[in-house]
Amino acid sequence: MIQVLIDADNLSAPQLRALVAALPAGGMRIVVAGSPRALASVAWPPRATVIAVGGWQQADLRLAAAYRLTDEPLVLGSGDGDFSLLAVNHPGPVLVISDRPASRLRGAGTVTDPVTDGTAVLRRWLDEVAG
């Protein structure tokens, strides 16, 4: 099962919408955290766990707590360097969704911005890891 962690405060509304639109209907565990305003900008799939938070770093803390260490693929919807160690040490393939990822995230796996790059890279990566 592909693990998807999304920091709604770290991506723009168009990036969030493009990411959600590209995700397949099944085989995913989706957890999204962010401010109520950021969360309201997207129609989240019913299968997503949506966590509204307030305050600095609260979305990061909730997503870190939701992370599961498995060798299954990880999609990280954030360019925040706070997730660098998580992504670098993840034993499975990692896809980072961001237009300006922290330098350590760039070395963790594939990086794409579905707005600038289109969704082809994202969809191809998902197809490859799904086998």
Where are these regions (language model features)?
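N-terminal extension/subdomain marker
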Residues: 1-29
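Nuclease catalytic cores that cleave nucleic-acid phosphodiester bonds
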Residues: 29-131
